[in-house]
Amino acid sequence: MLTPTVRKFQYGQHTVTLETGMMARQATAAVMVTMDDTAVFVTVVGAKKAREGQDFFPLTVNYQERAYAAGRFPGGFFRREGRPGEGETLTARLIDRPIRPLFPEGFLNEVQVVATVVSVNPQVSPDIVAMIGASAALSLSGIPFNGPIGAARVGYINDQYVLNPTQDELKQSRLDLVVAGTDNAVLMVESEADLLSEDQMLGAVVFGHEQQQIVIENIKALAAEVGKPRWEWHAPEVNVALQRRVAEMAEARLGEAYHITEKQARYAKVDEIKESVIADLLAEDDALDAGEISDILGALEKAVVRGRVLRGEPRIDGREKDMIRALDVRTGVLPRTHGSALFTRGETQALVTATLGTERDAQNIDELMGERTDRFLLHYNFPPYSVGETGMMGSPKRREIGHGRLAKRGVLAVMPSQDAFPYTVRVVSEITESNGSSSMASVCGASLALMDAGVPIKAAVAGIAMGLVKEQDNFVVLSDILGDEDHLGDMDFKVAGSRDGVTALQMDIKIEGITREIMQVALNQAKGARLHILGVMEQAINAPRGDISEFAPRIHTIKINPEKIKDVIGKGGSVIRALTEETGTTIEIEDDGTVKIAATDGDKAKHAIRRIEEITAEIEVGRIYQGKVTRIVDFGAFVAIGGGKEGLVHISQIADKRVEKVTDYLQMGQEVAVKVLEVDRQGRVRLSIKEANASAAAGQDAPTDAE
């Protein structure tokens, strides 16, 4: 008999249900989490033993959205879900980041978390539900896990924080922030903001962490009721004697190596020391394990670097804690791109381009929550040569997708509205060198490239990565961290914004005990660094260029009567197709009659506008037009008078005298002046050559050209 255990609680404006024991009973743990009709089924499976020779923690998080959850069929030829989309990849990272640091040091058993969206309410995003589900499943599994965590989304509407805002509320919000943490520590923050202050951002983090405590309490209660016993796992014993011996042989040498400021030279020296120590120790005792020695050397390396920072000594590259590396900023570095910039900060460098396109270049995204169009794309590429390595090149990896989204968040708040700038914009950041904070270099480069392209952004933005080294009550916040400081530190804290406020905040914390005071110090220090970088950027370009690139399409907008849209499009799109081929332009028509003509050549755009005006012009009775004979029949001739309009010249209206045979007076393709006699209710046009000739003889209206 299936007997599920259910726990229900109120979480802000939503009701959350945790249910276990009903499905996937062969998994280590499984939980169905529902929040107002959005349901995510989360399973956890953990291997009882680590693989032989395993030297890292193999945690995998898979997040998958099923089309049936929204009552839809998947797109594509096969009509089934395929590889994860960008949104699914980002949500998988969102789940992974706060749970990864909560597994104990030395735990190397394989763990897989699978979150499947099985029902979706369009107003309730599944990401928070999936994070709660992962926390609950891990807490029930018995796998060594120092959780549970809670998760919350925080909005900022009418100067008030809003817990887990609906999708409609998010459209009015100046903030979209996700925070996750344990009962006493914040572990992860991901956000985008509309130029909020540092205090407002910190307040949102604290608010979200306080509100999610009810989630943690209910997961703990569920685990106490039906959770499996915690595995009898013990951390591998530390060989203290070997630790001492390694320290004797390597500590001083590693300290000297970390005085080498150039990254590649330092890495080479550190590798040389490690290889030497391992070889010497194995020569002394071949029963020793090279992997264990390598792990001890890694821990010693970390202690050496952290100790220097905590003692107030200069950092790896000789800087003080709040110093920014040397900056080099250049714009317009590529001749044919619409906008470009080369941003260099120390040994981190980004070549960033901006490309302008029309509305048809926008990305149409078919998501579980519905379809949407994205007019601003930012892509981040991290090739292996940027760190002096060889490697596979191909489609973007999870990290590249995540870094690209963070950089996009940093710039999004300053992008102009569609009405102010009707272009689709694509920014690409090519990381050509990397030694820490390449995503924030991408924010700086994107701002510069957009201004170089003439995109009227509201303000320049810059990004900075902060780090933290903390031992007990002693802590040091580092500005503009190197890759090593990121790897060996306790916090990665990235902030992007303008002079007026924050546009994006991302935080990943590896330890507990990060207080509000520490976060406040980091945010304030980041603001100073950001303003310094903006000052240097403004020396290169201090405002968007007054005009877009000569190689970019110029968009000209005109308005036509919505009833005339069908005339411009034509049967099966024939007219608009012919227009684009004839004029060499791109033409887009909206339902309200707005027509956008994009062309790199101004004369071509003017030609297209003139043709559209002709097509949509009303035929005036009594007006003379220059037309072309298109068809000859027994009772007269049909004459095209422009804009795809055609009228009949009856045989009696060809000449002043009686006409026996139409072809005696008119030939196919002949150009003639015609006067409009009548437009009937059905839109049929009656023309007269006879009347046009009479008017011309009397010196009346000159004929209007019809193309």
UniProtKB/Swiss-Prot annotation:
Transmembrane segments: none annotated. It catalyses: RNA(n+1) + phosphate = RNA(n) + a ribonucleoside 5'-diphosphate. GO terms for cellular component: cytosol. Keywords: Cytoplasm, Magnesium, Metal-binding, Nucleotidyltransferase, RNA-binding, Transferase. The keyword Transit peptide does not apply. Residues 622-690 form the S1 motif domain. Its main location: cytoplasm. This is Polyribonucleotide nucleotidyltransferase. The lineage of its organism: Bacteria, Pseudomonadati, Pseudomonadota, Gammaproteobacteria, Enterobacterales.
